[in-house]
Every structure is written in C-alpha cells, then in structure tokens.
Curated annotation (Swiss-Prot):
<feature type="transmembrane region" description="Helical">
    <location>
        <begin position="448"/>
        <end position="470"/>
    </location>
</feature>
<keyword id="KW-0813">Transport</keyword>
<dbReference type="InterPro" id="IPR001750">
    <property type="entry name" value="ND/Mrp_TM"/>
</dbReference>
<feature type="transmembrane region" description="Helical">
    <location>
        <begin position="270"/>
        <end position="292"/>
    </location>
</feature>
<dbReference type="GO" id="GO:0006814">
    <property type="term" value="P:sodium ion transport"/>
</dbReference>
<feature type="transmembrane region" description="Helical">
    <location>
        <begin position="368"/>
        <end position="390"/>
    </location>
</feature>
<dbReference type="GO" id="GO:0042773">
    <property type="term" value="P:ATP synthesis coupled electron transport"/>
</dbReference>
<feature type="transmembrane region" description="Helical">
    <location>
        <begin position="204"/>
        <end position="226"/>
    </location>
</feature>
<keyword id="KW-0812">Transmembrane</keyword>
<dbReference type="GO" id="GO:0005886">
    <property type="term" value="C:plasma membrane"/>
</dbReference>
<dbReference type="GO" id="GO:0008137">
    <property type="term" value="F:NADH dehydrogenase (ubiquinone) activity"/>
</dbReference>
<keyword id="KW-0050">Antiport</keyword>
<keyword id="KW-0739">Sodium transport</keyword>
<comment type="similarity">
    <text>Belongs to the CPA3 antiporters (TC 2.A.63) subunit D family.</text>
</comment>
<dbReference type="Pfam" id="PF00361">
    <property type="entry name" value="Proton_antipo_M"/>
</dbReference>
<feature type="transmembrane region" description="Helical">
    <location>
        <begin position="107"/>
        <end position="126"/>
    </location>
</feature>
<keyword id="KW-0406">Ion transport</keyword>
C-alpha cells in the first residue's frame, strides 16, 4: 500500500514524458491527458482515504531507511493538498480543451501541464528539504514554459519578472539548505525536527528560519515580495491562469506551514509573530490593489495576494483553531480562485476583453454564467452560508481568543473590501446595459461552463457541509501541531 504514495507524482511525470512523443497529434494528446488526469484524481482520493483510515503512510525509495534515504510522506495535510491539486488539474485541463489554441498545443502545452502537476504533488509529498527544492524547480520550469506559451509581447515582458524572482528564490533556497545542513547534518524533515529541537543556537536557527520564510514568501506571494504576481498571472490564457492562481502560491504557503510547524517551531515568539505581521500587511496591501483595479483578471490576481494573508494568519496565531481555520481556508480558496479565473476566461471569450468598463449586461444574455460567478464571488468575500464565511470566522475567532485584535480587525476590513471589489466586477460585467454585439450575446457558453460547474458545486458543499469539513480540518491541525506524530512515522522511533 505504501507504493500508492508515489503515484500522484509518477502518473503526471510519465504521462508528460509520453505526450512529448505525440506533440503533433493534438486529439490523441487530449484523450490521453483527459484519462490520465482523472486517473490521478482517483488515485489521490484513494490515497487520502487510506491515510485517513490507517494513519501516515511513508514510502522509503530504494528501501533506504530515513533519514539516510529519500522518503515520501503522506499525512492528512499532504493528501488533502494532493486531492485539491488533482481537482483543479482536472477542471483546468477540460477548460483548456475548449479554449487553448492549436498554436499553444503544438508547443508542448500538455506535457508541461503534467510536469507542473508532478512538481506540485511532489512538493506536497516529499519528506526532505532538498527534494522539496527539486520539486519546486520541476514545477517552476514547467510554469516558465506555460506562462510564455503564445509568445505575446506582454507575456514575455511580464514572465521575465516571474523567472527572475523565482531564480533568485531558488538560489536563496539552496543557501538555506546548505546552511541548515551545515549545523544539523541532515535534510530529512523529521530528522531536522529532532535535531533542531536539540540545538541551543536560537539566533542561528532564527536566521535560517528567516531565509526559508523569504524563499517561501516569494513563491507564495507574501508582502512585500508579491510584486511579480498580478502582471504575471494576467498574461496567460484562463486555463493556465486558473491553474497558477489555484495552485502555485499554495505550494509556497504549504511549505511555510509544513516547515514552521515541524522544523522552525523553536522560537514562535519571534518566527510566528513575524509571520502574523506579514499576514496582516499581505492582506491589506493585496486588497488595496484589487480595489484600485478595473480589470477582471487583475482584480483576481491581487486577491490571490490578499487571500494568502488569511492562510498564514492562522499559522501566525498558532493555535489549533487558527490552524484548522487556515486549512479550511486553503481548501476553500483553491477551489474558488480556480473557478473565478475560469469565469474571467469565459467572459473574455464572450466580450473579447477583461476591461470591466467595456463590459455590461451579461446577466441578461448569459444568466447561468452570471449567477455561478456571483456564488463564487460572495464565497470569496466570506458571505454565509458559503465556505469563505466559515473559514474566515474560525480565523477571526481564533484571533480574538488569542487577543490578536489588530489582525482580527484587518481580516474583517479586508473581507469587506473583498466584497466591494467582487461586487464591482458583478455590477460592471454582468449588470447594466449590454455593451457586447449580437454575435457575442448569442455566444454558446455552455461548454465553457461545464468544467466550472464542479468547482461551484464544491464551493457550495464546502459551506453547507461546514461541520464535517471543519472537524477534518481540526484533525489536520492536531496532526501538524504535534510533530512527534510525523517524526515517529518517518523515523519509526
């Protein structure tokens, strides 16, 4: 059963490699891709059920026992993230079938799509820091290709910033890996948790912790290192933007939550207070960017920034309720954000623009599109009874219980500004007078909406099934707040 752990990585990697051989056969690529991504989702669900029933699953590659060999570790948090990545992978791929041009398909869109999923799943499942770096690079190299597909001037200019900032982050990552190896002699996360706990060099460990925080903050889009994100995510087609918006920043957030609950928990008075400050600044400046925009995709891009602030807010508060709220919020945000980017793509196909001032009246001509967007928008803003409300409520309640009143006030204010900016999209794009042509009004949007329906349905389910989902989030929080569970499973102590 342990071999199941590698399948969410192996399936997309093998499929991506295989699809390179059929670069000119687009129809065949679509068929293979469709079956493969659904298969990956089914395997991910099976793995998650197994871990939930039987506990943490560890795969020692080559039968080299940890901490000496490479290990893959599937716990509740990792398997949840793998399932979410697979869901977004399925939906975005089927949306791409409708929207990606043959020009982009012939330049290896499908192979690199799967390589990116392999990197994402690998980052969630790896049990050591060096292979976390390796999977980050697999993911990022694939994203470099996907972000420039089409080769427009805007894409190339903005993707250069994306590449430069991530190359710098990768260099800093290696520096951090070398630094922590030099004082502990290991890179296995479970072994690091043990050895860091035995060290009395708090100052040195804090420096290393800050290095890793900067690295993951660059990749996760935290203040003040988010400047690359809004314009980089504006250029690619909607399917790619949705994949990036739903997943890529969450890999950075996952890495922060994993390392700062397992390894760098030696001085929470310093590290987690710093994280809490960054969370507040990220939320505030991200939502200000969203409020100031009048472009559909740019508003959504800035909201990625503001919303990751909520996720690390839970880590900064560092209580069971706060971590559970953050876990719930991550699941909510991945689903909702992917849906919203796909809605942006659908409206762009109808109107030919993402400029809100050039839109209007879509509610009359495309009511299903309008109301499905509305559900996702108010969920993002945190309106009950949808998923955004319950996750934000848990985070804000945790802040009040922990007497973190300032961050609670920031979270409430950001929620109101999020609602304002999302209603601005709804009013400009869907309300008012029709500004598109008769041909655009008659555009058949059904095929585009079909892949988005599961995401909207999940958004509703995550809200109406809040009780069992929050109980699961509490279980995840209990597991990651008790490092001994992870350590004993990996090191078999």
């Amino acid at each position: 059963m342990n071999n199941l752990v590698i399948l969410p990585i192996l399936i997309p990697f093998i499929v991506g490699s295989f699809l390179i051989l059929f670069a000119k056969h687009h129809s065949l690529q679509r068929v293979i891709s469709g079956f493969a991504v659904v298969g990956m989702l089914l395997v991910s669900i099976y793995l998650a059920v197994d871990v939930y029933q039987n506990g943490i699953t560890v795969l020692e590659l080559g039968n080299w026992q940890a901490p000496f060999g490479i290990v893959l570790v599937a716990d509740l948090f990792a398997t949840m993230m793998v399932i979410l990545a697979s869901i977004v992978g399925v939906v975005c791929l089927f949306f791409a079938f409708q929207t990606i041009s043959s020009e982009r398909e012939k330049y290896y869109f499908y192979p690199f799509y799967f390589f990116l999923l392999a990197g994402v799943n690998g980052a969630f499942l790896t049990g050591d820091l060096f292979n976390l770096f390796v999977f980050f690079e697999v993911m990022l190299i694939a994203s470099y290709i996907l972000i420039v597909l089409g080769g427009t001037k805007y894409q190339l200019r903005e993707s250069l910033k994306y590449v430069v900032i991530n190359v710098f982050a990768s260099i800093l990552f290696i520096v951090g890996v070398a630094y922590i190896y030099s004082i502990t002699g290991t890179l296995n996360m479970a072994d690091l948790a043990v050895k860091v706990g035995e060290l009395e060099q708090t100052g040195v460990l804090n420096v290393i912790a800050v290095i890793f925080l900067v690295v993951f903050a660059m990749k996760g889009g935290l203040f003040p290192l988010y400047f690359w994100l809004p314009r980089s995510y504006f250029g690619p087609p909607a399917a790619i933007a949705a994949l990036f918006g739903g997943l890529l920043t969450k890999v950075g957030i996952y890495a922060i939550m994993r390392t700062f609950t397992l390894i760098f928990n030696h001085d929470p008075g310093f590290t987690h207070t710093l994280i809490l400050i960054l969370a507040g600044l990220t939320m505030f400046f991200g939502v200000l960017g969203a409020v100031s925009q009048f472009d559909f995709k740019r508003i959504l891009s800035y909201h990625i920034i503001s919303q990751v602030g909520y996720m690390v807010m839970g880590l900064g508060i560092y209580t069971q309720l706060a971590i559970a709220g953050a876990i719930y919020y991550i699941a909510h945000h991945i689903i909702v954000k992917a849906a919203l980017f796909l809605f942006a793509g659908a409206t762009q196909r109808i109107t030919g623009t993402t400029d809100l001032k050039k839109m209007g009246g879509l509610l009359k001509t495309h009511p299903w599109l309008a109301w499905m967007f509305f559900i996702s928008a108010i969920s993002l803003a945190g309106i009950p009874p949808l998923s955004g409300f319950f996750s934000k409520f848990a985070l804000i309640l945790a802040a009040f219980l922990n007497e973190n009143y300032i961050i609670a006030a920031v979270a409430l204010a950001v929620g109101l500004l999020t609602l304002f900016s999302m209603m601005k999209i709804f009013i400009y794009a869907f309300w008012g007078e029709q500004k598109h042509t008769e041909e655009q009004a008659n555009f058949k949007v059904g095929k585009l909406l079909l892949p988005i329906v599961p995401l909207v349905a999940l958004t509703i389910i995550l809200g109406f099934a809040a009780e069992p989902i929050f109980q699961y989030s509490l279980q995840v929080a209990d597991q990651i707040l008790d490092p001994t569970i992870y350590i004993e499973s990996v090191l078999k102590e």
